[in-house]
Amino acid sequence: SYMAAGGKAIVVTTYTDQDMTNFKSILDEYGVSVTKGILAETDNGHYYQNPFYLIPEVKSNTYTSDFADSKYVFAPYAQGLTVSENDALSVTQMLVTSENAVVKDDPQNMTSYESEDGDETGQFTLGAKVEKTADDTTSTLFVFSSENLFTDESSQMVGGSNLQLFTRVINDLSEEQSSVSIPVKEYTQESITVPQNQFVFLGLTTVILLPVLLLTAGIVIWVRTVSYTHL
């Protein structure tokens, strides 16, 4: 087959209630298993506004080095991946959740984003590269678990880092040494995405602390004015 002969492929999973037996068997060959449901983050430093809007930890490597320490990646409605490594399989992690992610097997009927009875919890992979070596031949599988990961909308939410990741992966698949991606100029305001904990802090600063500081400054000025008037 193509992969057995040293082929390269990219797979992006999506949530479905159908039994994808053949699809799962392909992933099994590369030590990859996929959770049945969708991941919710309970760590507010790893999601944006909605616990299904994941902002994973970016592992620094060849594919993420341009933005791993300076930008976020936006991965909404992702499934969880578990990737095994052995003598035949070499794994490069790219995107992972916090250790507090929760699998929601039936997201349409769930009652809470928090862990409930029967929910699987832990850290999950959202993106990885798996190299399989057999008979001195190495094949490569890139696997990602959010079908919205490489859309323009998701990439724009984080300043284009999703597109940077996609470009690096495609370069590897096509065996290009480098590629220049020039975004089309659009006269639209770029979205700024921050994790939920930072979003809450900024909100408290704007709604509570800033008015208090302004009120305090006003009182100080008034007291000084009254004191000066009575001199």
How would you label these PLM feature ranges?
Residues S1-S178:
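Acidic, S/T/G-rich, low-cysteine, solvent-exposed domains in lumenal/extracellular/periplasmic regions
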Residues K8, R224-V226:
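Basic side chains
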Residues S178-I182, L214:
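Intrinsically disordered or highly flexible coil/loop and linker segments, enriched in small
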Residues S181-L204:
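Short, aromatic-rich amphipathic segments at membrane interfaces
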Residues G203-L215:
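C-terminal substrate/ligand-recognition segments
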Residues V212-R224:
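Alpha-helical transmembrane segments
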Residues T229-H230:
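Conserved small/polar residues in nucleotide/adenosyl-binding loops
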